[in-house]
């Protein structure tokens, strides 16, 4: 089990399957099964416009886990994974606990179905470590920082690995997600690290033409 506490129920909107959701589209592009026809259609449309996007979820996942391994090897044993998405074959706490069995992780995501699937399917923690899930949005950093789940799971006086990986490009600039990240970084103790990946149009060309 993660902490031995019963999971809090999370209700999904009644029409959740009528509109594509970024977490489900990302899951589809990454070869997952936690998606619906509307998400697959959206994903196919994106790949048709930007063929290189097809491999992006796998690449960013590889990057994030490599970064977690490096941080854990360097002594970081606490991780705040924001925009965690649906559980993958190997998750942040599993990667970290292979190096340090005491590692702790808080997963954060705004998508209701991610919360349900994470609590139901995520692999158990080592007895010495722990993981928890917090339903929250990167754009509301104070809710994350002030959450009892975060404070009960992580020691905010010790270095933390902050992982807003592959999430900023999903938010409009008008919401100023970069300011939310700055707010989170300022709140972290000395010795903390941030692992960040971001889509760029540099490699997302329309096909393989010369434009």
Residue ranges and their predicted role:
Residues 134, 160-164, 180-201:
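Conserved beta-strand signature within the Rossmann-like core of class I S-adenosyl-L-methionine
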Residues 1-136, 140-156, 185-186, 197:
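Rossmann-like AdoMet
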Residues 137-144, 169-178:
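Active-site glycine- and acidic-residue-rich loops that bind
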Residues 64, 177, 181:
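Aromatic/hydrophobic pocket-lining residues that form the small-molecule binding cavity
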Residues 88-89, 170-171, 203-205:
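Short catalytic/ligand-binding loop motif for oxyanion handling, primarily in non-cytosolic enzymes
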Residues 117, 138, 195-211:
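Class I (Rossmann-like) S-adenosyl-L-methionine-dependent methyltransferase catalytic domain
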Residues 167, 191, 208:
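Active-site rim beta-loop-alpha module in soluble metabolic enzymes
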Residues 154-169:
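Short SAM/SAH-binding signature in class I
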């Amino acid at each position: 089990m993660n902490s031995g506490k019963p999971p809090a129920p999370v209700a999904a909107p009644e029409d959740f399957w009528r509109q594509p959701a970024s977490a489900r589209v990302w899951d589809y592009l990454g070869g997952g099964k936690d998606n619906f026809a509307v998400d697959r259609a959206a994903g196919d449309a994106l790949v048709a416009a930007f063929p290189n996007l097809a491999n992006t979820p796998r690449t960013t996942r590889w990057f994030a886990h490599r970064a977690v391994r490096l941080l854990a090897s360097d002594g970081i044993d606490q991780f705040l994974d924001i925009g965690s998405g649906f559980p993958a074959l190997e998750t942040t706490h599993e990667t970290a606990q292979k190096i340090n069995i005491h590692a702790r992780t808080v997963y954060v995501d705004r998508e209701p179905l991610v919360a349900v699937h994470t609590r139901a399917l995520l692999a158990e923690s080592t007895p010495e470590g722990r993981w928890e899930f917090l339903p929250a949005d990167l754009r509301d950093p104070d809710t994350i920082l002030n959450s009892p789940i975060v404070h009960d799971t992580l020691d905010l006086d010790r270095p933390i690995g902050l992982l807003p990986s592959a999430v900023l490009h999903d938010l409009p600039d008008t919401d100023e997600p970069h300011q939310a990240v700055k707010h989170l970084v300022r709140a972290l103790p000395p010795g903390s690290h941030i692992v960040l990946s971001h889509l760029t149009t540099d490699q997302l060309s329309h096909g393989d033409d010369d434009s």
